[in-house]
Design a protein with these regions (language model features):
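Short, structured coil segments at secondary-structure junctions
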Residues: 62-64, 71-72, 178-180, 239-240, ...
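Surface-exposed amphipathic alpha-helices with a cationic face
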Residues: 31-39, 103, 175, 211-215, ...
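Conserved acidic, metal-coordinating active-site core of Asp-based
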Residues: 112-227, 231-233
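Hydrophobic packing residues within well-ordered alpha-helices of enzyme cores
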Residues: 30, 55-59, 170, 174, ...
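Mg2+-dependent phosphoryl-transfer enzymes with acidic/Ser/Thr/Gly-rich catalytic loops
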Residues: 2-10, 26-27, 199-283
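Non-catalytic pre-domain segments flanking phosphatase-related domains
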Residues: 1-13, 39, 61
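Asp-based phosphoryl-transfer active-site loop
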Residues: 7-23, 98, 237
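Active-site phosphate-binding/coordination module
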Residues: 25-132
Length: 283
């Protein structure tokens, strides 16, 4: 997993808001730091909410070889081929239940398979918003009745888009009525008036898959580090022995991190800052 062949530790890096700056570029300092980390014995992975197709381009540009964590911990994939190595999935029946709930609350429903995003024609209006997760968007006449996303292995997650009030109500319903099936959260999408409610398989988060990856590599939690900026990074912050919060991270996220970074998603450089500390401390 490293060019030196001797593994000193594992570093998991969030994409949007951490490695990727606000303009979706990678700072030169961060790219160089990742190369240096690999050459000096660290396994580097990406841990993101994006799907396979939204993750692989960045991983390939950086030359990463360690398996990648996608769909907020729902998938562990081969960095070269994109093949799923491990997955946590929502069954087709449960996905249909989620879609029904989203539609009942007046939201536009989306289903995320491992490598594509599925919606109907109304949902396609928000293509510029949802293509952060994946640029592979499949539009169906009716999402509920479409067969294209109904694969035996299930789906990665469901999302509903709408206004703040409707999203909040849908989120509350899913958390109250289906707590044993889904882990549901809702949030604003950037500075837009659009809000999202997202449901993952119950118990699924980045931290769980990160520790599964560490076990594959034969590394203890004390030799695992995570770099992130948002609430979906809290699971891996809790699991990792060392955690780094970006400068723009909310106070609730920074509070649980072991280290606070000065760099932000506007400046870039947070990954380089964190890797520098790890290389100094992990002798």
């Amino acid at each position: 997993m490293t060019r030196s062949g001797q593994l000193r530790g594992l570093v998991a890096i969030d994409l949007d808001g951490t490695l990727l700056r606000d303009d979706k570029s990678v700072a030169d300092a961060d790219a160089r730091a990742i190369v240096d980390a690999v050459e000096r014995g660290l396994a580097v992975t990406l841990a993101t909410g994006r799907l396979i197709t939204g993750t692989l381009p960045t991983a390939r540009k950086l030359g990463l070889v360690t398996p990648l964590i996608c769909a907020d911990g729902g998938l562990l994939i081969d960095a070269a081929t994109g093949a799923a190595l491990e997955r946590r999935a929502i069954s087709i029946a449960h996905a249909a239940t989620a879609i029904e709930a989203l539609v009942a609350h007046g939201l536009l429903p989306y289903v995320f398979s491992a490598d594509a995003l599925h919606c109907d024609s109304a949902g396609a209006v928000h293509r510029s918003i949802v293509d952060t997760w994946s640029r592979e968007i499949v539009v169906h006449p009716s999402l509920m009745h479409a067969e294209g996303w109904r694969h035996p292995e299930g789906i990665a997650l469901t999302v509903g888009l709408g206004n703040r009030v409707a999203v909040g109500r849908a989120s509350e319903h899913l958390r109250q009525a289906h707590a044993g099936t889904f882990d549901t959260v809702h949030f604003n999408l950037g500075q837009s008036p659009v809000w999202a409610v997202r449901s993952l398989p119950h118990g699924c988060d980045k931290g769980d898959m990160l520790m599964r990856l560490a076990a594959r590599l034969g590394l203890p939690g004390t030799r695992v580090a995570a770099i992130g900026d948002w609430f979906n990074d809290l699971g891996m912050f809790a699991a990792a022995g060392r955690s780094f919060a970006m400068g723009q991270a909310p106070d609730a996220v920074r509070k649980v991190a072991t280290d606070h970074l000065a760099a932000t998603s506007a400046t870039g450089g947070g990954v380089a800052e964190a890797i520098g500390k790890l290389l100094a401390d992990w002798t």
